[in-house]
Structures are given as structure tokens and as C-alpha cells.
Amino acid sequence: MRILFASSEVHPLIKTGGLADVSASLPQALKRLRQDVRVVMPAYGSVLDKAGDLEQVTTLQLPGFPGDTVTLLSGTLPGSRVPLWLVDAPRLFRRAGDPYRAPDGHDWQDNYLRFGLFARLIEHLALDRAGLDWRPDVVHCNDWQAGLAPLMLSMHESRPATVFTIHNLAYQGLFPRHAFDALNLPPQLWHYQGLEFHGKLSFIKGGIGFADHITTVSPSYAREILTPQQGFGLDGLLNHRAGVLTGILNGVDYREWDPGKDRHLVARYSADDLSGKARCKAALQHHFKLPCHSGIPLLGHVGRMVAQKGVDLLLKAAEPLLAAGEAQLVVVGSGDATLEQTARSLAERYPEHMGLHIGYSEPLAHQLEAGADIFVMPSRFEPCGLNQMYSLRYGTVPVVRNTGGLADTVVDADPAHLAARDATGIQFDEATPQALADALARALALYHDPACWKRLMQAGMAQDFSWGRSAEAYLDLYKDLVS
């Protein structure tokens, strides 16, 4: 089957979140299932620096973008055999900053043009209008940045099937009315049943409203987004399309995330020999200038510092533990300036008990997963989440809120599951500092029971969330759409 996989970010070329991991791992898993899958993404300047050998395959003038000559570059996704197409429109994509924001942290004002052009290019590839003599059976678009492509393709009678995956409904690609006009979209689409959303243009509605099938990244999240609490104003549309909505759990690339092979670690280890994990803990403590005390529980967190991730809950719940010297905490992430400052203040108050890295570092993320005893993920909502699955494989017991993919992947250490020896972590329900503090107290009590803690670690390490299972589910969906 021929599959065009469209994403605005793909690891290891560029990454701001889990979308990049999925956009690398799922195509590779489909390739291993002998599918003809090709990835298309924008040619940001930093991507061109990392992409290796590239060949110019065609030059296009896309309708609606008279000022931009688009060059399509062909290569291979690094570390794989997956063909890669890069959309090179220098005025729009070769910029400093990340894919969506300027160096000052503000969104690029012309993101609607940038990702409108990206969608138009996806349409041309899908209809084999780029002169490449290749037409996909399925076009798989991801998040709002590719959201207009299913809409554009829906206007053609003879076209590939379309799949749209929601990785995080909170990010919708909303723009002023003038953006709709600038993209020369059909006037009849300026309607609540089209692309209009409370007076703004919504890119994500292009995918949700017009794709042949919608997926999201865990079964629980697929149910949650049908509710007013988690639907972000789109629950009505999603309920209308619930018959073509499926939750497919993301997978983990265990070639990248395996403590037995991880090149970023000072020592490697397995469920049968955990001695290397103690060395990783000592190395993490040393890196953050914390006392290298093997007996103190070390809590870890990696993620964007935004309200969704519940970092504020973590900082409030952890402070009494830090003040009492009952735990250490290491946090890696960046985002909201207020949350960053709160984290800095806490680290300054407890320099012997808290380490902080503002920013993101892939090696450090691996080292934290290996060195921490407990990974804390108190998300207010979490479409899937990857770090809790990484933590399980690394024997780092996750403490998670009972939501979305966290609920689907972590088995709570309640008395019944402890007795059955299938518990893998701690869940809590309410998004409050007290509920998290209670969950951490449960975790610490188990930590101080070494035999029980080792069973928890080993049960987590035995879990299998590999991409093969997820890729087969997507392939079954693709086949249903084209049959």
C-alpha cells in the first residue's frame, strides 16, 4: 500500500514534542510491514542541516502562493529506509526559532501561510500533480499544521483516502478572518460547519470535519475529547463524526529507548540485572550537584512547562518532601515563563534536593529516565504520553494522573493489583496538589519496601508498547478505507 505521511516535525530532524517521535516511528514501523510509506515535511533551515544528501526532484508554483516557488527535495529519514520529501519554500520555512515560533517565543504571524502552503503541497502530491509518477492510496495527516489537506482533497472526486490524527486537541491552528481570505479558500467554508470557529479560521477543523477517518493517540483520549471538558469547543463536531473516530495507542521505539542499549547512559541494565540503574542514578545526582545518596528517592519530570502538563501541581506537591529531605527532584523542560520562574525559585531554595534544566536535551532526557526512581506525570490531560512508557521500560515507576493515554498504559498499585503482581505504577484522579501529594506518599511507601518496589519495576519493564502493534492497527484502518 502507498501511504503519504504528512507532519510538521519528524525526529531526529526537528522536535518540539511527541508528534516528532510518532512521525518518525510510525512510518518506520509501516516500512517494516513492507508498505510503501513516504514522509513529507517542511524544509526548515535546521532540517536542511541535518537531512544528509538531498536531491531536487521538482519545482512547483502552487495556486494561491504566487510569490513562492516551492522546491521538493528528496532524501531518506536519517537512521531508516523511509523516503523523505522536504518542502523547500525559503521565505516561509528557512527561519530561526522553532517550527512555529520566532526566537522571542511568539508565534510566527504568517503561520497560516506557511502551513496553508504545506497543505496545498500535500494535495498536489496526493493527486500526483508534482510530476513524480507516484500516487498514494492513503494520505495520513497529523495535527492542525496539516489540517487543511483533508479538506482540500475532499473537493476532488478521484482522490486517495484521508486519515487525520489528533495528537493534542488543545492546539487548533486558529487565525483571524483575513487568513481565510488570504488562502483563497471557498467562501462557503466560512461557516460553523466548515472552517469557521468563533469568528476565526480553524485549521484543525479541516481535518476533523473532512477527513475520511479521524484517529487520536489513545483509546481513553478518543472518549475524552467527546466531552465538553476535554473537547475544547469541538466536542459537538467530534460527536457528529464519532462513527469515524478511533483511538490507537502510540508506541515506543525501543531501539531508541532501551536501557540495555542506550548510548546516552553511563551504565546499561536490564530487568534481570538492575545494578546499572544505581550507577545512572548516581550520575544524574552528580550532574545536578545533588548529594549522591543511593537511598533517597529521586523524582524526575521531563516535559513542556505548560498548564496541561501539571508542572505547577508537581512543584507544590514536591516542596514539602524537599523541605523535609525526604526526596530529591530533577526537572527538565521549558515553556511558560511564570512556571519556569517558579521552578527556578524552588531549586534555589533547595539546592541540595532539586536539580533544574530549563530547556530540552535528548541525552539528558534519557539520563533522567534511567537515573530517577520515580517519574512524575501529573497532566491535566494527556492524549497519549510517551514518557510514562519510557519510564516503564527503564524501571522508573511512573506516578500519573488517571487521564488519556496515562490511564491506558499504567496499572495502579492498588491492593488488588499488588496482590496480582501486575501493578506498574501509581494513578491519581484529581488534578490538585493534594491528590498528587497523596500519590507520591503511596509511591514513597512502596519505595521503602525494596522487594515490592523491585516487583513494580520489573512488571513495568516487562510491558510491551512497541510500534509494531500500533502500525498493524493503522494498516488495518488504511485497508478498510481503500477496500
From Swiss-Prot:
GO term, biological process aspect, one: glycogen biosynthetic process
InterPro entries: Glyco_trans_1, GS/SS, Starch_synth_cat_dom
Binding positions for ADP-alpha-D-glucose per the UniProt entry: 15
Reactions it catalyzes: [(1->4)-alpha-D-glucosyl](n) + ADP-alpha-D-glucose = [(1->4)-alpha-D-glucosyl](n+1) + ADP + H(+)
Record protein name field: Glycogen synthase
Domain of life (superkingdom): Bacteria
Keyword Kinase among record annotations: no
Pathway: Glycan biosynthesis; glycogen biosynthesis
Native source species: Thioalkalivibrio sulfidiphilus (strain HL-EbGR7)
